[in-house]
Each structure stands twice: as C-alpha cells, then as structure tokens.
C-alpha cells in the first residue's frame, strides 16, 4: 500500500490496495491513521459493488440513516431518471445544485456525519469534480482575536435554511421533514481522534446564537469562503471506479457543475457520528 499526500493541507491518494477484498486489521489501521491525518483519502480505480462499498464503510463505524428514513444504505446522487438525463429545471436537478455550496454532510442533524464515502459510477466528459476544504488549517490561519471570540460560540444548522432555495422542502414528505428541526453545533470543534481544532461552518449553518442574525450570517459566510482557499483545498477529477472517503467533522466539500445534458451518477454511503444516542443510526447497526 502506498499513501501519497496531495500538495494541499489535506488529502492523500492510496494505491496498492484492493478494497474489493477484506482488509486485514493492520491494513485498515494504516488507512484509518492516514484518514485522521489527511482527512480525505482517494482510492482510484476500485469499481466496488454495493456490498463491497458498504463493507468498507462499516469498518469506520455505523451507517447513517438517510433523510428519507427509508432504510436505504446508499444514496444515489444522479441526474438520471427513467434512463434519461433530467432537465436542469427539474426538482431532481435543482436539488443537486445545492451541493455546489460548501457543506459538511448532515450538519443539520443533532449528530453530524462522521464520514462520507463517495464512488463514481458515471462521470461527465468535463466538470463534475468534487472539492474539499481543510477547516483545521482554516482555523489555524485565523487571527488570535478571532479564535478567542469564536470559542464557545454556537451556530444554528438548519435543513430548511440550506435546502429550501433548491427544492429541498418539496422533495421530502411532511413526515420526513418533522425529523429535520434546526440544531446547534459549536462553531469551533475539537477532533476526537487528533485533538486538532477546526471550524464547523458551511451552507447548513444559518446564524450564530446570541449575535445579530445578518451580521453572524455574513461572518459564517466569510469564515467559509476565506477558509476554503489554497493551499487548504483539493479538487478531484473523477474517473469511473474512484472512491473517496472524507471526514465531515473537520472538512467541507462541494461539487462542481457539469454540462446539463451529460449524465453523472455517484453513490454515497455515510458513517453516522459516534454518539451512543445518535437517532440517525441505521436500525440494523443501532446495537453495534
């Protein structure tokens, strides 16, 4: 196995390992250590089946229940319906546009996602990349006075706030939306495995509690945009079969647009946050 860091402050490419085969404990420990260090790991040319994708995912923890609460283990992020590319004005396409803004998966839940594993199945001829931003290095780059001011601050994260402009309230049933009430997360978090501090912001963060609404929204947007600058970002051009895992606890990500008439099919699994009372754990994993 070879682990080659990118030139950014995050990300490494892992080669010489076949994720279609069961991993030894030693090999997985090396992968997990690299993941904690680099936060984003790229595994080229894996071509995993759904079962293999899920088996690797479960090495990192329990599976997260999707917002549809339909028991699905995998989320299909696609602009295909009934065998054809959907028009850009369709609800399905509009919903995907929201993913082009920086975010941490599931931060609008009480317990945000631990990890996401995204596999490329069909990719467009141009565009459609995914980009990650290192919020550990973003925190490190802040002025001391800003670090001090942010300490202890709580932000409200809201599914409605981030998804309503992109049809997110229409795509879910009323019963599903009942489970997606606004939640609070610390603006500065400490990673449980590394002890490093990082910003926890992105599109789902609506405002900072106890501060002026518009001023705090502007600050959150500035922290996100200024944090997501080189050398703290890595952008991956997908090839079919690629798999990437990232740490939602300390990394933001966004997708890039691609030609509206070209297909893009990605499959994602999500590892639930390590909270024993996490209500978003898949039922079959809840007792694990």
Segments predicted by a language model, with ranges:
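Non-heme Fe(II) oxygenase catalytic core, chiefly the N-lobe of the double-stranded beta-helix
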Residues: 1-243, 249-288
